[in-house]
Amino acid sequence: NYYKKLFGSGTTLVVT
């Protein structure tokens, strides 16, 4: 599992 910060949108994509 890892969390990748989506720059520009300011949201976080959570991939398990």
From Swiss-Prot:
Subcellular location, principal: membrane
Subcellular location: Cell membrane
Keyword terms, alphabetized: Adaptive immunity, Cell membrane, Immunity, Membrane, Receptor, T cell receptor
GO BP annotation list: adaptive immune response
GO cellular component: T cell receptor complex
Subunit architecture: Gamma-delta TR is a heterodimer composed of a gamma and delta chain; disulfide-linked. The gamma-delta TR is associated with the transmembrane signaling CD3 coreceptor proteins following the stoichiometry: a single gamma-delta TR heterodimer associates with one CD3D-CD3E heterodimer, one CD3G-CD3E heterodimer and one CD247 homodimer forming a stable octameric structure. Upon activation, gamma-delta TR complex associates with FCER1G to initiate intracellular signaling.
Described function: J region of the variable domain of T cell receptor (TR) gamma chain that participates in the antigen recognition. Gamma-delta TRs recognize a variety of self and foreign non-peptide antigens frequently expressed at the epithelial boundaries between the host and external environment, including endogenous lipids presented by MH-like protein CD1D and phosphoantigens presented by butyrophilin-like molecule BTN3A1. Upon antigen recognition induces rapid, innate-like immune responses involved in pathogen clearance and tissue repair.
Protein name: T cell receptor gamma joining 1
UniProt organism field: Homo sapiens
